[in-house]
Amino acid sequence: MSQRPDTIIIGAGIAGLATGCYAQMNGYDTLILEQHTIPGGVCTAWRRGGYILDGCIHFLMGCGSDQGFHQRYREVGALEGNRLIHAEHYLSFFDESTERSLTITRDLDRLAHDLRTLAPADGGFVDRFTVGIRAMQGYDVDVMQARSLMRPVPAPVHLWNARHLIPHFAGNRISLEALGTRVRDPFVGWAMSNLFVPEAPVPFIFAVLAQLTLGELAVVEGGSLNFSLGMARRYETLGGQIVYGADVTEILIENDRAVGVRLSNGAVYRADRVISAADGYTTIFELLGGRYTTRSIRARYERWPLFAPLLLISYGVACEFPNVPPTSVIRLQRPLSIAGQTKPRLVFRVFNYDTTLAPPGKTVVQVYIQTDYDWWEALRKDRARYEQEKARIAADVLERLEHHLPGIAAHVEVTDVSTPHTFYRYTRNYRGAFEGWLVTPRTIRHALEHALPGLQDFYMIGQWTEPGGGIPVVIDAARRFVQTLCHQDRKPFRTEAEVTAP
């Protein structure tokens, strides 16, 4: 690349890497500045004592070879050298008080049968729910089209292209939490509310479960970092350059134009345009000093709901649990007490399906608990208490897991606890929100602006401009963004997808 790139991209997360790939494909000379020592942002994994602990992908949508998202993954190199492990299960629900359970697999007929058995008075609901899933089978999910269909008045072209889906979108512009209230059976209602975050719109879960039934949900063997490393390799092969350990502290402005950035070490990089794929709040209110905002932008960061920050508790275990579903949601008989809050639910994953993450005969178990950001930020100032609380929670959670994974406590070799501050420290995500704006029936309708008012040659990309975030969404958004740049510069948009399928 030349000494001075025409485009600087802040952040080598998925959005930054995808933007860089598509920009390089189209003749732009780009430089990515990343504050961490590795690419990927939230899409990462790390090693502890012979175990690989995955911090990101629960399921990757659009992994069918004929899916548009699958083509996007290939275009940006995410699948090159990586093997996909296709999901056979989605979630298993268990209520400790009643010992009732429900497991959702690829078999939609089995799901319908199990729901009717559990909730015989809810037959009408079961029919509508499974019809909604079937309607999405074979449908190539398009972000813009789905977003349009969730609006009160969808765009005519989207109405026509997805006309068979209209009844399922129009009648379900509600959250999963609201869906659960329509079920008479309390256990099934609870399960419906917890199919994803309770605030998520129902059509989203129709799409997820439809892809599950067709074998189009997957994870990347070896952990999420492999996905990111594939994209970084692709970007560098296309001529792009990544500078690691580059902590951007200021976006340089001249005459209301972005002309470069300054790093924490004083180094300055200049370019014709600056694209921030970093945290939205940090970008707008710190790197730009809050100079280019509107009332609506400020209100968004003050009031819009965020994905709740997480406690991620990982155990490297010297045994396997071959008959346990990959992901379980437990309704606890004795709620946990964490960060001053009562937690009646426990979600855990068992990584038996990926033998590369642990030595032979061993596996990784991970627990996810939503928690309070401010509580942990206050506690971390007292390092001793911070570490004590992490250890207390890890021990308490392990005791609860023993009921569901007999023998686990005696075989734990590694324990690792990530708090909301850990997420913030490694990714700078606002208030530890790992996926940005919470996906709700309201927020999913919006595609937010890439530019800021009054500022030229500057753009934002990533989960803070795409409510709900997620890997396929931000890759697709990066592709559309570079298409827009090409249109502005009067050049044809092109891609260079790998010819050989992974």
Where are the predicted features?
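Short loop/edge segments at beta-strand edges and connector loops
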Residues: 86, 244-246
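A glycine-rich dinucleotide-binding beta-alpha-beta segment and adjacent secondary-structure elements
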Residues: 185-199, 347, 407-467
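Extreme N-terminal leader/targeting segments of oxidoreductases
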Residues: 1-7, 25-26, 493-502
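Active-site/ligand-binding neighborhood in enzyme catalytic cores
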Residues: 134-238, 245, 426-441
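N-terminal glycine-rich phosphate/pyrophosphate-binding loop and immediately adjacent elements
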Residues: 3-138, 438
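A conserved FAD-binding loop/helix module that cradles the flavin
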Residues: 57, 463-486
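Mid-domain catalytic core of redox enzymes
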Residues: 219, 249-360
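C-terminal segments that line or cap access tunnels to active or ligand-binding sites in enzymes
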Residues: 318-421
